Swiss-Prot record:
Residues 278-303 are annotated as: Disordered. Its EC number is 2.1.1.107. This is Uroporphyrinogen-III C-methyltransferase. InterPro entries: 4pyrrol_Mease, 4pyrrol_Methylase_sf, 4pyrrole_Mease_sub1, 4pyrrole_Mease_sub2, CobA/CysG_C, Met1_fungi, Siro_Cobalamin_biosynth, Uropor_MeTrfase_CS. Signal peptide: none annotated. One of its GO terms (biological process) is sulfate assimilation. Disulfide bonds: none annotated. It catalyses: uroporphyrinogen III + 2 S-adenosyl-L-methionine = precorrin-2 + 2 S-adenosyl-L-homocysteine + H(+). Gene3D superfamilies: Cobalt-precorrin-4 Transmethylase, Domain 1, Methyltransferase, Cobalt-precorrin-4 Transmethylase, Domain 2, NAD(P)-binding Rossmann-like Domain. Keywords: Amino-acid biosynthesis, Methionine biosynthesis, Methyltransferase, Porphyrin biosynthesis, S-adenosyl-L-methionine, Transferase. GO terms for cellular component: nucleus.
Length: 593
C-alpha cells in the first residue's frame, strides 16, 4: 500500500480513546425489533467505562423488563419510561456541565426518522457527540468492534472498516487477537508495573505533574498518555556508554525499558524484572558466568575511543580430566523474513542447546527456536551496548565450557557491521573456533525488497555499503559522491541529521533520490522515498521503525512510477507499507529433507 500524504482521503474519522468516567450517556429508544442486544451492548460498554447510561423512551415494555432485569442492580443505570423530549439533552446531564448530556445514542424505529433528524441537529448545535443506529448521516461518531482483555490488563483492540463491513471488521479483530501470545495479559500488566515503578523511583519530584512536562514524556520513550505522540525518530539516539551525563544516567532505566518493549520477544516480556537491568548494566554486579580473570573482551571501537578500561570476563573453571567441549556457530538470520533464512541457519537453530540472539532478530525468526532450547537475548540499549556484549560473550563461553552447542544468532550477516569478526577472535582465543554461516545482509536484501535495483545498466554500476556511525559516535569517513553508485548506509537513521549534513558538506547532491527502508521483509516493512536533502526532516515526520537502512542513488526510483516521485516543498516523501510476498511453512519444509 502506497501512502501519499497529499492524496490521503480527507474524510477518514479521527480515532481516539475517550474517557467516560461519571459522564451521562443518553440512549434514546431501544430498537425496533424484539431483540434489545444492541442497547445492552452499549450499556455494558458505558458502565465498563465508568459512565452513567440513561435510557429514554424504551421501544416496548418487553425491552424495559429485560433491561431492568440485567442492569437494575447498577446505581448508575436509569430508565425513563416516557417519550423523548429535546429538552432532555439539556436537563438530564451533570451539574458540572450545566445539565447538558455528554453523549447520545439513538435507536428509534424507521417511522421516527424525522425525530432522529431533529435530535441530530440539536446535538450538533450543542456540540454533543451523537450516534444514530444505521444512519451515518445523522451520526458524528461510530462505535467500533472492540476486544477488551478479560483479565483486566487494560489492553483494548478496536478495528473499523469505516462502513465497509461490520462483519469484516469483527473478523479482522478476531484474526489480530488470535495472533497475540497466550500470555498477553501478563505481558501488558508486567510492562505497566515496571513503567510505574520506574516513574515512582526515578521521577518522584515530577510525579505530581502526571507525565506532563516530565522526563517520561521526553522524546524517544513513549510513556505519556498519548500513545501516538512520542517522537520515535529519537528512540535510538546515540548514547556514549562511558561518557553519559548525569541526566542520561538518571534516564538509563527508562531507556532500557523502552528498548525491551520494542525489541524483546513479546511472549518473554511477562518475565522481565528490573533486576535484569541491574545485572546487565552495573559493572559491579556479576552474573553467574562473570568474574574477573584474565579473559578479556576483544577491543572495540567504542571502548578504545572512550579510553575506558575494558571489563574482563572469566573463563569458567574447567574440571580436571577429559571433558566434552562445546561447539559454537555464528549464524546470520537474514533481514527478518523466515523465507530469507538459509537452510543451514535453520538447521543450526533447530539443533542448538542454547541460542544467543541479537535484540534485532525479529519475532518470526525467534519463533522457530524449539521451546526447550535456552534462549538469551542481548540486553543492548543505547548506553549499555558494551556491557551487554560482554555479558553475552561470557554466557557463550560458560555454555561452551559446559559442553553445549552454542548458536550466536545475528541479524543480517555476521560480518557486515555485525561484530562477527570480533566474536570469532574472542572464542578462538579461548579455544573454540566458530563455524560461520553467512546470512542475507539487509544492506543488499532491502534494496530488492524496496524495488530498488542496486545495479542497473545506465543507472548504477557500483554499490557501496557504509556505516552511518563511526568511532565514538563520530561521522565515518565520508565517501566521495559518485552519480552512478548506489550507497547503502546502515546504523544511520538515528542520526540522520548529522550524517546528511556531513554528506552535503562533502559535495553530495542534495537532490539525489533516497529511500528509508525499515524492517525489511517483515509484515510491517516500510519504504519511504524522498530526496537526500529532506531525509532528516522526513525521519522526524514519520518516526522510527528500527532496524532500517538508508539507500541513496538514482537506482532508488528506477522502477517507480514517475508520478509518485514528483517531490516538491509541499510533497516531500511517499510511503509504501507492508510486505507479504513470501510465506514459508517451516515444518513442511523440513519434511522435504
Amino acid at each position: 500500500m502506497v501512502r501519499d500524504l497529499v492524496t490521503l482521503p480527507s474524510s477518514l474519522p479521527l480515532i481516539t480513546a475517550g474517557f467516560a468516567t461519571d459522564q451521562v450517556h443518553l440512549l434514546i429508544g431501544t430498537g425496533s425489533t424484539d431483540s434489545v442486544s444492541v442497547c445492552k451492548n452499549r450499556i455494558h460498554s458505558i458502565l465498563n467505562a465508568g459512565g452513567n447510561p440513561i435510557v429514554v423512551n424504551p421501544s416496548s415494555p418487553s425491552h424495559t423488563k429485560q433491561l431492568q432485569l440485567e442492569f437494575g442492580k447498577f446505581a448508575k443505570f436509569e430508565i425513563v419510561e416516557r417519550e423523548f423530549r429535546l429538552s432532555d439533552l439539556t436537563t438530564l446531564g451533570r451539574v458540572l456541565v450545566c445539565k447538558v448530556v455528554d453523549r447520545v445514542f439513538v435507536d428509534l424505529p424507521i417511522t421516527q426518522s424525522r425525530l432522529c433528524e431533529e435530535i441530530f441537529w440539536q446535538c450538533q448545535k450543542l456540540r454533543i457527540p451523537i450516534n444514530t443506529f444505521h444512519k451515518p448521516e445523522f451520526s458524528t461518531f461510530n462505535m467500533i468492534p472492540t476486544w477488551v482483555d478479560p483479565k483486566g490488563s487494560g489492553l483494548q483492540i478496536s478495528v473499523t472498516t469505516n462502513g465497509n463491513g461490520y462483519i469484516l471488521a469483527n473478523r479482522i479483530k478476531r484474526d489480530i487477537i488470535s495472533h497475540l501470545p497466550p500470555n498477553i495479559s501478563e505481558v501488558v500488566i508486567n510492562m505497566g508495573y515496571l513503567k510505574d515503578r520506574i516513574i515512582n523511583e526515578d521521577h518522584k519530584a515530577l510525579l505530581e505533574e502526571k507525565y506532563y512536562q516530565t522526563d517520561m514524556s521526553l522524546p524517544g520513550f513513549g510513556y505519556g498518555l498519548d500513545e501516538d505522540g512520542w517522537e520515535s525518530h529519537k528512540f535510538n539516539k546515540l548514547i556514549r556508554e562511558f561518557e553519559m551525563t548525569s541526566r542520561e544516567q538518571r534516564l538509563k532505566r527508562t531507556r532500557w525499558l523502552s528498548q525491551i518493549m520494542e525489541y524483546y520477544p513479546m511472549n518473554k516480556l511477562s518475565d522481565i524484572k528490573l533486576e535484569d537491568f541491574e545485572t546487565s548494566s552495573s559493572p559491579n554486579k556479576k552474573t553467574k558466568q562473570e568474574t574477573v580473570t584474565e579473559g578479556v573482551v576483544p577491543p572495540t571501537d567504542e571502548n578504545i575511543e572512550n579510553g575506558t578500561k575494558q571489563l574482563q570476563l572469566s573463563e569458567v573453571k574447567k574440571e580436571e580430566g577429559p571433558k566434552k567441549l562445546g561447539k559454537i556457530s555464528l549464524v546470520g538470520s537474514g533481514p527478518g523474513s523466515v523465507s530469507m533464512l538459509t537452510i543451514g541457519a535453520l538447521q543450526e537453530i533447530k539443533s542448538a542447546d542454547i541460542i544467543l540472539a541479537d535484540k534485532l532478530v525479529p519475532q518470526a525468526i525467534l519463533d522457530l527456536i524449539p521451546p526447550k532450547t535456552e534462549t538469551f537475548i542481548a540486553k543492548k540499549f543505547p548506553g549499555n551496548a558494551e556491557r551487554a556484549q560482554q555479558e553475552l560473550l561470557a554466557k557463550g563461553l560458560e555454555s561452551l565450557d559446559n559442553g553445549l552447542k552454542v548458536v550466536r544468532l545475528k541479524q543480517g550477516d555476521p560480518y557486515i557491521f555485525g561484530r562477527g569478526g570480533e566474536e570469532f577472535n574472542f572464542f578462538k582465543d579461548h579455544g573454540y573456533i566458530p563455524v560461520v554461516l553467512p546470512g542475507i545482509s539487509s544492506s543488499l536484501a532491502c534494496t530488492v525488497l524496496a524495488q530498488i535495483p542496486a545495479t542497473q545498466r545506465d543507472i548504477a554500476d557500483q554499490v557501496l555499503i557504509c556505516t552511518g556511525t563511526g568511532r565514538k559516535g563520530a561521522l565515518p569517513i565520508i565517501p566521495e559522491f559518485v552519480e552512478s553508485r548506489t550507497t547503502v548506509f546502515l546504523m544511520a537513521l538515528h542520526r540522520a541529521n548529522v550524517l546528511i549534513t556531513g554528506l552535503l558538506k562533502h559535495g553530495w547532491d542534495g537532490d539525489v533520490p533516497a529511500a528509508i527502508v525499515e524492517r525489511g521483509s517483515c509484515p510491517d516493512q516500510r519504504v519511504t522515498r524522498t530526496l537526500l536533502k529532506w531525509v532528516p526532516e522526513v525521519v522526524e515526520e514519520i518516526g522510527s521503525r528500527p532496524p532500517g537502512v538508508l539507500v541513496v542513488g538514482k537506482a532508488v526510483n528506477a522502477l517507480v512510477e514517475k508520478d509518485l516521485i514528483n517531490f516538491d516543498e509541499s510533497r516531500k516523501f511517499v510511503i509504501d507499507e507492508g510486505f507479504r510476498e513470501f510465506e514459508v511453512d517451516v515444518d513442511s519444509l523440513f519434511k522435504l529433507y
